[in-house]
Amino acid sequence: MSQKEVADFGLIGLAVMGQNLILNGADKGFTVCCYNRTTSRVDEFLANEAKGKSIVGAHSLEEFVSKLKKPRVCILLVKAGKPVDYLIEGLAPLLEKGDIIVDGGNSHYPDTTRRCEELAKKGILFVGSGVSGGEEGARYGPSLMPGGNPAAWPRIKPIFQTLAAKAGNNEPCCDWVGEQGAGHYVKMVHNGIEYGDMQLICETYDIMKRGLGMSCDEIADVFEKWNTGKLDSFLIEITRDVLRYKADDGKPLVEKILDAAGQKGTGKWTAQNALEMGTPVSLITEAVFARCLSSLKSERVRASKKLTGPNTKFTGDKKQLIDDLEDALYASKIISYAQGFMLMREAAKEYGWKLNNAGIALMWRGGCIIRSVFLKDITEAFREDPNLESILFHPFFTNGVEKAQAGWRRVVAQAAMLGIPVPATSTGLSFYDGYRSAVLPANLLQAQRDYFGAHTFRVLPEAADKSLPADKDIHINWTGHGGNISATTYDA
């Protein structure tokens, strides 16, 4: 090792997340090299936040690479998309076989798979790692979800598991996820669940605010109480804080915020992928659509003056409804996570990934936005049965939904009577009822498809006979009286 090769790893991208991850590394005993395309930011960082710490700077990619111990570990925290490709194009010629590039941004998993394959041809090991926890998580311990070229894991494991948050018995919220784009895929699903959790909380707030006429402080008190029990989570905690925050005039700041939600696309990716996989991730998808509907602010204002609906106030037992809301939120969250793990199960089959669901749940227990107390129970469920088909089949969650569902149903019914939209809460309940139904009306749907498009259908084994044979794709002439049965290629 030359005197120049001093850094245990390097990081490119000095926005707040990048700076905080570097400071996290320095605090935990690593020497870190930093670089930014706008090199003045390197100097500013070294002169301020990084001053006196084991952090060195570089003013070019060449200098950056020269300061890294071999095999080199280069972490990129830059905007997803073309900026990542441009940076890789600049870095790759400077690296040697066995060196590692880690993309820690919110990249789309197919891009990560492509980059893995392209860089493997050059002998460079590529990793796409989900990073969750926001600015504070990056600074003190994020959830890290690395996947890509498995040959990189032995080198980056001690770095990543040291940087990561700890949960349970000091277990790091980081483990190897899988090959290709598996790490970024799991982060995508994490973000989809995050969309679902946030929408569920907003719907719960809306019923308390508009349905019960509660103040923000009163609602904050409810969330604070819930955060000591089965709903204990980061998002419940920050919701309490947000509701209590006052503007300069002493009024709740949240009431002054425009009700048009933004989104960066990762929730949409989850919904799109669910459709491609044919997996009913309905709650997360409704959460995405709820943001889309919120963005139609001016149109909604016009609609509010033209379209009628219930305008009644709740007159029942307020305490009972608040208790029901707790149950509805809890049960709906279980559905959201069940759907997320269902989607990852299908992705593992599709892409040949060996996903460790217990490990994924553990990664999400600390440091990340969706961290919550019941992730411990998901971890334990998958440790007991790594092949668990659905978390809904584990006794803890089966019993949890069983106890909560009466209140859940009352909330959905009451929201409808009050005219308050609860798209995520209601679709969660609809999924639950559909999932537990041995018989669904898809038989009629199949008949309709065969009637207008000759798409064929199959019959129930117990209903089969000579005219309607089992295990055959059947087409009927629906305008006659039976007959004209023909087998064709089944087209779903």
Swiss-Prot record:
Gene Ontology cellular component terms for the protein in this record: cytosol; mitochondrion
Pathway(s) where this gene product acts: Carbohydrate degradation; pentose phosphate pathway; D-ribulose 5-phosphate from D-glucose 6-phosphate (oxidative stage): step 3/3
Broad class of enzyme this protein falls into: oxidoreductase
Domain of life: Eukaryota
Residues with PTM Phosphoserine: 107, 215
Residues annotated for NADP(+) binding in this entry: 13-18, 36-38, 78-80, 106
Annotated catalytic residues: 187 (proton acceptor), 194 (proton donor)
Catalyzed reactions per annotation: 6-phospho-D-gluconate + NADP(+) = D-ribulose 5-phosphate + CO2 + NADPH
GO biological process: D-gluconate metabolic process; glycolytic process via Entner-Doudoroff Pathway; pentose-phosphate shunt, oxidative branch
Residues where substrate binds: 106, 132-134, 190-191, 195, 264, 291, 449, 455
Segment forming the signal sequence: none
GO molecular function: NADP binding; phosphogluconate dehydrogenase (decarboxylating) activity
Keyword entries, A-Z: Gluconate utilization, NADP, Oxidoreductase, Pentose shunt, Phosphoprotein
EC number: 1.1.1.44
Primary role: Catalyzes the oxidative decarboxylation of 6-phosphogluconate to ribulose 5-phosphate and CO(2), with concomitant reduction of NADP to NADPH.
Oligomeric form and interacting partners: Homodimer.
PANTHER family for this protein: 6-PHOSPHOGLUCONATE DEHYDROGENASE
Family (UniProt): Belongs to the 6-phosphogluconate dehydrogenase family.
Family annotation (NCBIfam families): gnd, PRK09287.1
Name of the protein this chain belongs to: 6-phosphogluconate dehydrogenase, decarboxylating
